[in-house]
């Protein structure tokens, strides 16, 4: 089921609006300083502009906390519309929770200044979606007639169906409750939105459209599991754009078919080619995507939706990543896709299953820092992978693929570069120059407990070398209170920024 946005309800959907400062200017830029600092080594002419910070209110619209995925679409003359997902949830997570559930903001930016000219809620928190993570926008470059925003729930929580939910109901196996893990789409022009259950019930990090020149729409989606190491890569194929909205596509899971040494038995969990640790820097594997039964993809079996898909993937020897994050296609050759895996401490082989496991405390892991994978799709068939290799590895000192990054999370490409944002900890933004092959640090998040996220190529709107990104502070909140149950409710600090790095 899809729903069209009711703009008349927006005032009622703005949480805490009467308690927050209201900014009534036509064009607005946050008075807060940028939440990132450019590296001294960036080219001359580099700059960062802070656009809007969490908690700031414009004509009744409040920019919520935990901004994450970003998608861009043409706005009215002289502007670009920016859609931003918010990774919020009222379900307690490590002792804290947000004041509201996930939402999507729509913010118009003036192309000449980057200032905000208008803002509204594109998908309201009352729908009860949880933890919208990264996101992407598909448009004419990806074969879409309408600009379509893709995001998804990064959670496996089992919850009551929200009172305001209009696009989904309970799951049969756990009724009257439902489990998180929906992929969600939104039409940038009409405001219509809908979950796409057949895209897999999993911890969706991001979904992107891959314009490989095939006669089908091909969407890749990544599993940012909370139970690492047990993530998978999925492909959703649809005959046309409308079939995505009506969920008439099919879901497929990645499996290796061949290593450098020759073909492997795809069904054998001891084939030495079914997980992250089996693929080492310098290796070049091949693979295929195998079909996921529709009832399992949609989560309508007798098991909880995510449990059913995970069990099916293990039974069918689907390639096991550790914790998949963002992904982006190469704008020079769209059949090439870069995929981030943030890694995890204490990950080692499991001799009993032929897969991976996390060892006990003190175990020396083999994938602490994560990787970037490079996947090349077949020219004629999106279900065939001609090359699957390690592109950058944070745990392989001495190898040509070694990059001293820690836990890559969000990524995007331009015609010249790959940008990689680290998770919390180091929280650096890495710039990889396709022309020279070099890696360098472009910027770092100021708050050591925060992270940057959602980076997207904005060169079509703000000129070459332009990127829009956001920051999740984690270490500070705009507003917080402890509820009767002892849970810290918060509106976490965050910020949207425009970064320009000449040549990137």
Describe the predicted segments one by one:
Residues 2-11:
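Bacterial N-terminal signal peptides that target proteins for export
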Residues 11-22:
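Bacterial N-terminal signal peptides
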Residues 3, 22-23:
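Short hydrophobic transmembrane-like helices used for membrane targeting/insertion
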Residues 26-504:
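Sequence/structural signature of beta-propeller domains
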């Amino acid at each position: 089921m899809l729903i069209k946005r009711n703009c008349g309800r927006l005032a009622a959907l703005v949480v805490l609006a009467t308690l927050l400062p209201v900014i009534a200017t036509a064009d607005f830029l946050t008075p807060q300083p940028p939440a990132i600092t450019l590296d001294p080594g960036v080219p001359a002419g580099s700059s960062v502009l802070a656009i809007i910070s969490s908690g700031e209110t414009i004509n009744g619209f409040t920019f919520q906390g935990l901004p994450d995925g970003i998608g861009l679409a043409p706005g009215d003359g002289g502007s670009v519309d920016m859609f931003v997902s918010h990774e919020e949830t009222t379900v307690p997570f490590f002792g804290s929770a947000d004041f509201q559930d996930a939402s999507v903001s729509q913010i118009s930016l003036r192309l000449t200044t980057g200032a905000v000219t208008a803002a509204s809620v594109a998908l309201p928190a009352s729908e009860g979606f949880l933890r919208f993570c990264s996101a992407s926008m598909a448009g004419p470059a990806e074969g879409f007639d309408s600009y379509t925003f893709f995001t998804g729930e990064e959670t496996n929580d089992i919850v009551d169906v929200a009172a305001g939910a209009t696009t989904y109901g309970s799951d049969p196996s756990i009724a009257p409750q439902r489990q998180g893990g929906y992929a969600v789409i939104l039409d940038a022009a009409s405001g219509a939105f809908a979950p796409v259950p057949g895209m897999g019930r999993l911890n969706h990090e991001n979904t992107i459209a891959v314009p490989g020149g095939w006669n089908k729409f091909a969407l890749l989606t990544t599993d940012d599991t909370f139970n690492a190491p047990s993530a998978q890569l999925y492909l959703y194929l649809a005959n046309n754009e409308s079939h995505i909205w009506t969920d008439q596509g099919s879901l497929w899971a990645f499996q290796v078919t061949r290593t450098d040494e020759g073909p492997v038995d795809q069904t054998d969990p001891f084939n030495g080619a079914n997980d992250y640790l089996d693929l080492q820097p310098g290796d070049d594997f091949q693979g295929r995507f195998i079909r996921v039964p529709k009832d399992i993809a949609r989560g309508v079996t007798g098991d909880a939706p995510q449990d059913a898909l995970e069990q099916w993937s293990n039974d069918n020897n689907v390639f096991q990543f550790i914790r998949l994050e963002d992904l982006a296609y190469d704008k020079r050759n769209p059949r090439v896709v870069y995929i981030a895996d943030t890694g995890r401490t204490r990950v080692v082989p499991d001799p009993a299953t032929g897969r991976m496991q996390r060892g006990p405390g003190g175990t020396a892991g083999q994938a602490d820092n994560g990787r970037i994978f490079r996947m090349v799709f077949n020219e004629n068939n999106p279900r065939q992978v001609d090359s699957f290799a390690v592109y950058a590895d944070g745990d392989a000192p001495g190898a040509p693929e070694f990059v001293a990054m820690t836990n890559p999370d969000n990524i995007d490409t331009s015609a010249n570069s790959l940008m990689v944002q680290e998770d919390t900890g180091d929280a650096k933004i890495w710039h990889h120059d396709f022309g020279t092959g070099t890696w360098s640090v472009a910027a770092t998040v100021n708050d050591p407990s925060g992270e940057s996220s959602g980076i997207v190529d904005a060169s079509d709107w703000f000129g070459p070398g332009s990127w829009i990104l956001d920051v999740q502070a984690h270490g500070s909140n705009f507003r917080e209170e402890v509820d009767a149950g002892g849970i810290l409710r918060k509106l976490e600090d965050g910020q949207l920024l425009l970064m320009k790095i000449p040549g990137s």
